[in-house]
Amino acid sequence: MEKMLECAFIVLWLQLGWLSGEDQVTQSPEALRLQEGESSSLNCSYTVSGLRGLFWYRQDPGKGPEFLFTLYSAGEEKEKERLKATLTKKESFLHITAPKPEDSATYLCAVQ
């Protein structure tokens, strides 16, 4: 019997520093349900003047956010276990390869 794995991804963005009228960060999808072992990606699109860094966090229920990655320039990639983060000029992706039940959490992106 296949186990259903629910990974909650919430549309939440954190803007560190001053927010101008044109700065925006959008995370999608809002929620994602995966079967164990089924890979997928989260998208974090941004329009920010003078990006100094993009951050990915993971938050388990009832706990504070846990830092995963910081990306500074387009083309940069970082990997940790089943997670891989990539950055382009306008968006970042968090790829989850072969997720397990313990990967169920809220994943957040933030820009500075």
UniProtKB/Swiss-Prot annotation:
It comes from the Eukaryota. Residues 23-112 form the Ig-like domain. Disulfide bonds join C44-C109. The keyword Cell membrane applies. The keyword Cell membrane applies. PROSITE patterns: IG_LIKE. GO terms for cellular component: T cell receptor complex. It is found in: Cell membrane. Residues 1-21 form the signal peptide. One of its GO terms (biological process) is response to bacterium. Keywords: Adaptive immunity, Cell membrane, Disulfide bond, Glycoprotein, Immunity, Immunoglobulin domain, Membrane, Receptor, Signal, T cell receptor. Glycans are attached at N43. V region of the variable domain of T cell receptor (TR) alpha chain that participates in the antigen recognition. Alpha-beta T cell receptors are antigen specific receptors which are essential to the immune response and are present on the cell surface of T lymphocytes. Recognize peptide-major histocompatibility (MH) (pMH) complexes that are displayed by antigen presenting cells (APC), a prerequisite for efficient T cell adaptive immunity against pathogens. Alpha-beta TR is a heterodimer composed of an alpha and beta chain; disulfide-linked. The alpha-beta TR is associated with the transmembrane signaling CD3 coreceptor proteins to form the TR-CD3 (TcR or TCR). The assembly of alpha-beta TR heterodimers with CD3 occurs in the endoplasmic reticulum where a single alpha-beta TR heterodimer associates with one CD3D-CD3E heterodimer, one CD3G-CD3E heterodimer and one CD247 homodimer forming a stable octameric structure. CD3D-CD3E and CD3G-CD3E heterodimers preferentially associate with TR alpha and TR beta chains, respectively. This is T cell receptor alpha variable 20. It comes from Homo sapiens. The gene is TRAV20.
